[in-house]
């Protein structure tokens, strides 16, 4: 049996399968289809022609536009029909034609999307991705499987992100770019193949980071990417100097972390 709150509004031309859980003030518009293992928390809106399927949970206040398909099976040759999950946070906006898939059993079985994210038309989040909070994915952005996008990153229209790549917090990936390697926090990546083109100074300023801090982060960036050694050696060498700068340390910790991908840099041959 479904659990449907009394204040929920479900159009007579919508299909809500037995077993679905529908919270207070949820709106399910005409021609929507909600699967039997779906949980829609309070004030979720499915406008029209929206499919929510699989073992999918959608947080409060999220709004989904027509032709989006959320919770579909992972597009992976390794998927054997196992039951996997998708968790979407609160107050996300999921525009027309967006697709977000569940995870795969071999990698924990879960795709996770945080809060306050904006997914513009026809963008795609593949299996096992981790998307943080306040992320903007512009039209036709494609995340391959196992991608991590950290908080407040912005991905420009039509860009593609290679599987297992990490996009750091408040990074910016330009439109039509190919992000084949990890992008540092506050980094700016452009082109195909993608090349690191400096820091996202505009984004840092909008986030309220003080100018003096931005200058220090720029100096750290130059030491890392313009020094004589490798990127990782250079990053290790300056850790003590920047120990009191949270933003610089965030970059250094990102570089030091284990990853399946190399690091994007101004010079792709160096890493």
Curated annotation (Swiss-Prot):
Query: What main location does UniProt list?
Result: cytoplasm
Q: Which SUPFAM superfamilies match?
A: Trimeric LpxA-like enzymes
- EC number(s) recorded for this UniProt protein: 2.3.1.129
GO cellular component terms, A-Z: cytoplasm; membrane
UniProt-listed InterPro entries? Acetyltransf_C (IPR029098), Acetyltransf_C_sf (IPR037157), Hexapep (IPR001451), Lipid_A_LpxA (IPR010137), Trimer_LpxA-like_sf (IPR011004)
User: Catalysed reaction per UniProt?
Assistant: a (3R)-hydroxyacyl-[ACP] + UDP-N-acetyl-alpha-D-glucosamine = a UDP-3-O-[(3R)-3-hydroxyacyl]-N-acetyl-alpha-D-glucosamine + holo-[ACP]
The protein's matches in Pfam families, at most eight in alphabetical order, are given as:
Acetyltransf_11, Hexapep
Q: In which pathway does it act?
A: Glycolipid biosynthesis; lipid IV(A) biosynthesis; lipid IV(A) from (3R)-3-hydroxytetradecanoyl-[acyl-carrier-protein] and UDP-N-acetyl-alpha-D-glucosamine: step 1/6
Per the UniProt entry, what are the Gene Ontology biological process annotations, in alphabetical order?
lipid A biosynthetic process
- Look at the named UniProt entry and state the broad enzyme category this protein falls under: transferase
Where found? Cytoplasm
Alphabetically ordered keywords of this record = Acyltransferase, Cytoplasm, Lipid A biosynthesis, Lipid biosynthesis, Lipid metabolism, Repeat, Transferase
What GO molecular function annotations does the UniProt record carry, in alphabetical order? acyl-[acyl-carrier-protein]-UDP-N-acetylglucosamine O-acyltransferase activity
- Keyword Secreted among record annotations: no
What Gene3D superfamilies does UniProt report for this protein, alphabetically?
Answer: Hexapeptide repeat proteins, Udp N-acetylglucosamine O-acyltransferase, C-terminal domain
Q: What function does the entry list?
A: Involved in the biosynthesis of lipid A, a phosphorylated glycolipid that anchors the lipopolysaccharide to the outer membrane of the cell.
Question: What family is reported?
Answer: Belongs to the transferase hexapeptide repeat family. LpxA subfamily.
Subunit field text: Homotrimer.
What the entry lists under PANTHER family is as follows:
ACYL-[ACYL-CARRIER-PROTEIN]--UDP-N-ACETYLGLUCOSAMINE O-ACYLTRANSFERASE, ACYL-[ACYL-CARRIER-PROTEIN]--UDP-N-ACETYLGLUCOSAMINE O-ACYLTRANSFERASE, MITOCHONDRIAL-RELATED
Its name, as the record gives it, is Acyl-[acyl-carrier-protein]--UDP-N-acetylglucosamine O-acyltransferase
User: What organism does the UniProt record list as the source?
Assistant: Rhizobium rhizogenes (strain K84 / ATCC BAA-868) (Agrobacterium radiobacter)
Its lineage reads:
Bacteria, Pseudomonadati, Pseudomonadota, Alphaproteobacteria, Hyphomicrobiales
């Amino acid at each position: 049996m479904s659990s449907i709150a009394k204040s929920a509004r479900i159009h007579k031309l919508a299909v809500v399968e037995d077993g679905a859980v529908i919270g207070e003030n949820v709106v399910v518009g005409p021609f929507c289809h909600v699967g039997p293992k779906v949980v829609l928390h309070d004030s979720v809106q499915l406008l029209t022609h929206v499919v929510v399927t699989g073992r999918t949970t959608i947080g409060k206040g999220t709004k989904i536009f027509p032709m989006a398909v959320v919770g579909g099976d992972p597009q992976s040759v390794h998927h054997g029909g196992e039951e996997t999950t998708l968790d979407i946070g609160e107050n996300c906006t999921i525009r027309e034609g967006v697709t977000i898939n569940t995870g795969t059993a071999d990698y924990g079985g879960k795709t996770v999307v945080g809060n306050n994210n904006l997914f513009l038309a026809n963008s795609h989040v593949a299996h096992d991705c981790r998307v943080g909070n306040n992320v903007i994915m512009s039209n036709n952005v494609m995340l391959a499987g196992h991608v991590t996008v950290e908080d407040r990153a912005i991905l420009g229209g039509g860009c593609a992100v290679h599987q297992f790549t990490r996009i750091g917090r408040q990074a910016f990936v330009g439109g039509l770019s190919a992000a084949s390697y990890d992008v540092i926090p506050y980094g700016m990546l452009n082109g195909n193949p993608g090349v690191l083109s400096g820091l996202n100074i505009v984004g840092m300023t909008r986030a309220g980071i003080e100018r003096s801090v931005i200058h220090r982060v720029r100096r750290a960036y130059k030491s890392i990417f313009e020094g004589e050694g490798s990127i990782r050696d250079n990053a290790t060498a300056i850790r003590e100097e920047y120990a009191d700068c949270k933003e610089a340390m965030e970059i250094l910790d990102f570089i030091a972390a284990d990853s399946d991908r190399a690091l994007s840099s101004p010079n792709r041959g160096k890493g």
